[in-house]
């Protein structure tokens, strides 16, 4: 029977051991018809930004009810060697944010680093998942309803598309919510 793949799952339960968090996440996924989860590097603790933390997560996920795959987190401090090490340790792709990575150790990437990372990931034949909101356009939004301004997503998506075209990087934008951005993908 076919099932869904949850791309970018956040696995973190405050106060629980990591293995327990994976057990709970796997059971919840299976109940919802999800047969594979791809874990986002954040809000995981430790954040999946180096090979050692990825190995820790892989061990903890060994008892999950569904197959678990992992994304490596790209941050301002990520080097080409870090990317290669994460891939060698089992990262099936990488994830970053242009505005807020969800945790201090997965902070937003600037334009120059985004382009460098994309070039490295193209060389590694890997994929990059990007939370594409332009941080400057977000300003000081207050509350969840104000945080996903369509123009912020459009500007972020424009930056990601330009960088991906230049580097040839396979890129997935997530989440994607502003209907006006669909025309950019044609």
Place the predicted regions along the sequence by residue:
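Histidine/acidic residue-rich metal-binding segments in metalloenzymes
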Residues: 81-186
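Hydrophobic faces of well-ordered beta-strands that scaffold small-molecule active sites
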Residues: 3-9, 37-39, 68-72, 92-96, ...
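Acidic, glycine-rich active-site loops and adjacent beta-strand->loop/helix elements
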Residues: 11, 42-46, 72-77, 100
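Short, acidic/polar
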Residues: 18-26, 76-86
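Short, surface-exposed connector motifs at secondary-structure boundaries
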Residues: 33-38, 64-68, 161-171
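Metal-associated gating/positioning segment near the N- to mid-region
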Residues: 1-63
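A glycine-rich helix N-cap at a beta->alpha junction
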Residues: 58-74
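Short, basic, glycine/proline-bearing loop/turn elements
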Residues: 8-13, 69, 99-103, 168
């Amino acid at each position: 029977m076919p099932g869904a793949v949850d791309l970018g799952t956040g696995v973190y339960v405050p106060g629980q051991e990591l293995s327990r968090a994976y057990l709970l996440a796997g059971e919840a996924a299976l109940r919802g018809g999800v047969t594979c989860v791809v874990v986002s590097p954040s809000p995981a603790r430790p954040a999946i930004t180096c090979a050692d933390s990825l190995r820790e997560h892989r061990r903890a996920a060994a008892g999950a009810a569904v197959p678990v795959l992992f994304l490596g987190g790209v941050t301002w401090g990520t080097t080409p060697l870090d990317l290669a090490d994460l891939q060698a340790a089992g990262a099936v792709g990488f994830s970053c944010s242009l505005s807020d990575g969800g945790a201090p150790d997965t902070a937003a990437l600037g334009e120059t680093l985004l382009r460098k990372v994309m070039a490295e990931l193209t060389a590694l034949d890997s994929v990059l998942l990007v939370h594409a909101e332009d941080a400057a356009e977000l300003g000081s939004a207050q509350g969840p309803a104000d945080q996903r301004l369509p123009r912020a997503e459009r500007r972020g998506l424009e930056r990601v598309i330009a960088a991906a075209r230049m580097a040839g990087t396979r890129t997935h934008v997530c989440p994607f919510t502003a209907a006006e951005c669909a025309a950019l993908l044609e």
